[in-house]
């Protein structure tokens, strides 16, 4: 029995995953993931999305199962809160505001900023220590802490590079992707029709702007990570009755060997006939409903 969450055409279609960008904004490197176009908007081939999502979810599951660390990254407004919510749900790490250059490649500097944040936290929580500061100084420290939290809250317990990067919007997060590539950190990413999938180990063709789509992705990612965590804890002899209490970021502290790159599905021949039929029927039904509404 599969340990990863199941995903189907209908769930993706209902979440609007099939809607790409206007045809004028496309990236030709995404051609093999595009089914066609409707009203000057590219339609993403959800048959491939289903297959590739399963590959990506398995990569997430295997990483956490082997005590690896996952870093979720998306700083776009509509994804910011969702990324944090689901990363915390599965006890992993996240960057959901500004990506600071060198977050992966210059970890020493980032670690220094995290140390500053922890010191500010300690000082501001110590009422006795605060008596030695003026109101202006305390206000300055509070603002400094808040500024650091925006960028570092999701990685303050990350003590080394992650074992897998999960990205929504490869265009916006190109710096994070470039740093991961330099450090040979595998990448899972949602790739829209205007994206460049070249450096992505586990691409998932899909809408990277819709809140419903983003929430669906993150829910699946978190569920896969939790399944991996459960297997890891079983192997360690942890009481599964206490599973819900184990969301401490320190749980995933061991390094794991790098996962082999999954074979990428880029041709419809890799998609089974049942999935082909399901996708085409779903699109036809959507068209019929649209025509009925406009009648």
UniProtKB/Swiss-Prot annotation:
One of its GO terms (cellular component) is cytosolic small ribosomal subunit. This is Small ribosomal subunit protein uS2. InterPro entries: Ribosomal_uS2, Ribosomal_uS2_bac/mit/plastid, Ribosomal_uS2_CS, Ribosomal_uS2_flav_dom_sf. Belongs to the universal ribosomal protein uS2 family. One of its GO terms (molecular function) is structural constituent of ribosome. CDD domains: RPS2 (cd01425). Residues 263-295 are annotated as: Disordered. Keywords: Ribonucleoprotein, Ribosomal protein.
């Amino acid at each position: 029995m599969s340990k990863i969450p199941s995903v189907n055409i209908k769930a993706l279609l209902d979440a609007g995953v099939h809607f790409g960008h206007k045809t004028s904004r496309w990236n030709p490197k995404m051609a093999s993931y595009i089914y066609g176009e409707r009203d000057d908007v590219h339609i993403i081939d959800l048959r491939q999305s289903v297959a590739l999502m399963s590959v990506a979810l398995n990569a997430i599951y295997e990483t956490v199962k082997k005590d690896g660390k996952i870093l979720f990254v998306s700083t776009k407004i509509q994804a910011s809160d969702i990324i944090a919510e689901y990363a915390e749900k599965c006890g992993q790490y996240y960057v959901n505001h500004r990506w600071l250059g060198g977050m992966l490649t210059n970890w020493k500097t980032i670690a220094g900023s995290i140390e500053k944040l922890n010191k500010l936290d300690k000082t501001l929580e110590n009422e006795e220590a605060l008596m030695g500061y003026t109101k202006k100084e305390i206000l300055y420290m509070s603002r400094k802490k808040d500024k650091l939290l925006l960028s570092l809250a999701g990685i303050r317990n990350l003590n080394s590079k992650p074992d897998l990067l999960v990205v929504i919007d490869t265009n916006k997060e190109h710096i994070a992707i470039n740093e991961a590539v330099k450090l040979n950190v595998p990448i899972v990413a949602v790739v829209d029709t205007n994206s460049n999938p070249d450096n992505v180990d586990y691409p998932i063709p899909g809408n990277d702007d819709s809140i419903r789509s983003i929430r669906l992705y993150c829910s699946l990612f978190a569920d896969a990570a939790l399944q991996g965590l459960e297997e890891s804890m079983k192997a360690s002899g942890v009481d599964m009755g206490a599973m819900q209490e184990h969301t401490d970021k320190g749980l995933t502290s061991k390094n794991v060997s790098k996962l082999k790159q999954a074979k990428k599905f880029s041709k419809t021949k890799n998609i089974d006939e049942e999935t082909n039929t399901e996708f085409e029927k779903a699109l036809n039904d959507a068209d019929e409903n649209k025509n009925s509404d406009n009648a």
